[in-house]
Amino acid sequence: MRRGSSESELAARWEAEAVAAAKAAAKAEAEATAETVAEQVRVDAGAAGEPECKAGEEQPKVLAPAPAQPSAAEEGNTQVLQRPPPTLPPSKPKPVQGLCPHGKPRDKGRSCKRSSGHGSGENGSQRPVTVDSSKARTSLDALKISIRQLKWKEFPFGRRLPCDIYWHGVSFHDNDIFSGQVNKFPGMTEMVRKITLSRAVRTMQNLFPEEYNFYPRSWILPDEFQLFVAQVQMVKDDDPSWKPTFIVKPDGGCQGDGIYLIKDPSDIRLAGTLQSRPAVVQEYICKPLLIDKLKFDIRLYVLLKSLDPLEIYIAKDGLSRFCTEPYQEPTPKNLHRIFMHLTNYSLNIHSGNFIHSDSASTGSKRTFSSILCRLSSKGVDIKKVWSDIISVVIKTVIALTPELKVFYQSDIPTGRPGPTCFQILGFDILLMKNLKPILLEVNANPSMRIEHEHELSPGVFENVPSLVDEEVKVAVIRDTLRLMDPLKKKRENQSQQLEKPFAGKEDALDGELTSAPDCNANPEAHLPSICLKQVFPKYAKQFNYLRLVDRMANLFIRFLGIKGTMKLGPTGFRTFIRSCKLSSSSLSMAAVDILYIDITRRWNSMTLDQRDSGMCLQAFVEAFFFLAQRKFKMLPLHEQVASLIDLCEYHLSLLDEKRLVCGRGVPSGGRPPHRGPPQEPSPSAQPAGDNPPPRTSCANKLSHPRHTLS
């Protein structure tokens, strides 16, 4: 009896377990049918190999729906029991279309902040800033150290998800990016080429000759070769004792490549090279400041943080690069001695006299601060030296920004998604014997290497860390990243909210905050003070009067018409003339067309870029100068130009107000308010026709006291 009873109980128990297994299988099938493919466990963290599971855990697998298992009673076999299928990972409800998995509206082209690592961490701590260093090239070592010091997260091989910051080694176009921040401006490489820089500075020299006398007089070859010969001969005829020296620099050259000195224009190497490789010839600075009887220059690092509004920072320290032969004024016998005349590091490192030193104040490469200390010990006014250098940097950037704006709107048109930009520039400055700073050139990609090559044996080299380079360059990169930190403002806003009364209750309702961050935790507490000093807009009041070409660029961009183009067509130029009411009985529209054709044809023949037809910005500036000189004949050029800009801006503001009224209706008070007409400068400057007289507050603009920039 017991045995039969136990067998029947066992069979009943097996049957009950089989029924339970069938029910579990049916439930699993229902869940699998509702969600055809199980949700992926984690979003792919990208090519950098971000871990998707905690250490020691097994990666969950995506399982296909399991077929329902029949019960033992249905099969007629109570002896063979099949186990229920393994349990699927717990599934999350599908997000509503247009919303992210957390119920937030989706941003077009952007992932959910939490799922992509853009929200707060699971433990309530702020997520680290992410940096894509896959295109960093020679600056990679210094960048890695900077990221490590900041405790940010580096992606050395890129990432599928967007990063906060992209670090490019060459240009803006190293990567195709549509969000975040990138350390290059579009067009910067083209703008600091020697010919383009010389033209930009020359435009400013025409307007403000005394303010821009820090750049040597330059001629562009081959276009201005005959002009160069004629002007040199004219000066020699007036002063037979004048024995100049000139330096020839290839337009696209770098690291001293192709540079040579001449005493006479006939010494220029014309044989085929200038046509394929244009160049700039400049007056050579024959009386530089010497230290230890050696010529040297200064590499200063300048951060262009923003283009509009303009923000400029200068590093408090830089590098001083020395020649390796004692300096002598140039003569026909020593013109070829490059180690005496050229300060380029890439040239002098091959000299047998080059001295590598870990000390900041000795060797062939030293810190600029050590040079200032040495000058200060001799009684030199260091504040005056710094003030003059800051002035050179600001004025140079003001000369570059107009055309940079045109490049920027071409690559990142207004209203379209795109990254924001910043860039570290290398300014090469020479101090003359009287301590006046002279701008030699600007580098879009200054070397950020922190090691040098050491020759172990003939032809065998190894890379050795350079403590001087590391001291200066790591600080520049690290503090640039600190200034560009995209989460800094968010942290500050959160701290301010938590300091308010009852802020805790409001934060509890905020879905973005999983827990309150520690207000007292300063992520930069362990870092030294920032080595970058803001100089603009800090000193904007002293330099804004120079930004005339910048205002012309705004007019130029307004009438471009097609987004993404960089040249103004004939229709756009006519529209500019009509909108600003510049045509008159003495300047017909036919004359305007001829002006456009003549200037555009000449500038297109001088530039190598023939991708687009039309009027470039420099051609527009020349046409604008011509119109200003016709309209305001009794004023200096900079006042003529300022008056015409004021007139154009006045008429365009009226046009904008008229469009606003047509779109929204006239306010109940009657006529819409607008700026009054500009004040009349003098009867001779009265515009023709019914045009209101322009404002000419240039006297006030130019009467700025010359403060020391500390």
UniProtKB/Swiss-Prot annotation:
Residues 41-135, 665-710 are annotated as: Disordered. Residues 123-135 have a biased composition (Polar residues). Residues 128-480 form the TTL domain. It is found in: Cytoplasm, Cytoskeleton, Cilium basal body; Cytoplasm, Cytoskeleton. Keywords: ATP-binding, Cell projection, Cilium, Cytoplasm, Cytoskeleton, Ligase, Magnesium, Metal-binding, Microtubule, Nucleotide-binding. Mg(2+) 1 binds at residues 428, 441. Gene3D superfamilies: ATP-grasp fold, B domain (3.30.470.20). Its EC number is 6.3.2.-. Residues 64-82 have a biased composition (Low complexity). The keyword Phosphoprotein does not apply. GO terms for cellular component: ciliary basal body; cytosol; microtubule. This is Tubulin polyglutamylase TTLL11.
